Amino acid sequence: MKTILIFLLSLVCLRATASDDPKALIRELNRKFNLVNDYTASLYMKFDVPGVKLSSMQGGVLFKRPNKFRIKAKGIFFLPKQNPMQQVSSMLLDTSAYTTVISGYEMLNGKTCAIVNIIPVKNDQELVLGKFWVDTKNILILKSQMTSRNNGTIETLSEYGSNSTYALPDKMTIQIEMKKMKVPKMMAVDLNKKSKEVVDPNKLEKGRIDLFFTNYKINTRLSDDEFKETKE
């Protein structure tokens, strides 16, 4: 009985230590990221971008390690230039490029999250600071804030389902500081035509993008040809 009690106490201590150690959390996240060599998924996108009228649309998303990424959809859509899913994973995998510290804990959707701060080692990086709310039980990023020199802060909320083993979300909500975001020229034209209100230049407007992922197919050995742009 005494041996069993000591064993159980050891397990509790190990879990507590892991949740208090940012490097242990990052290692487990990276283990999940490394399980994915490629994937495809159906994608539904909803947009709420100040001054720009964009319709919701269906499409598809493709990824192949290390950095091939493509969204297939007809029409104009607005997304950050970087792949919102793989930008985080590719950054965290390079553990020599940053230092980590846990700045506190917070409940998010009923789950205890460690707030892990990622600070780049070099001062000349585009990223200034990354903050990640990591579910300490399931080891998943539920929320992130990426602050860059040119595009301000991009905040992402993620919800997971049957593909949580691979850290692939069912839904992502992206919030963007529009004042600092570089808007594509073809969208800037729409912005000028459709926005008639006098906008306070000091007001920090935020855009919101909801991404819904279904029908994941993981590690199917995608061909590089799938990422070539085709003229329709």
Question: What do these predicted ranges mean?
Answer:
Residues 40-43, 54-58, 71-73, 157, ...:
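Extended beta-sheet lipid-handling architectures
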Residues 19-27, 31-35, 53, 67-140, ...:
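Flexible, processing/modification-adjacent segments and terminal tails
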Residues 112-227:
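Gly/Pro-enriched, hydrophobic low-complexity segments
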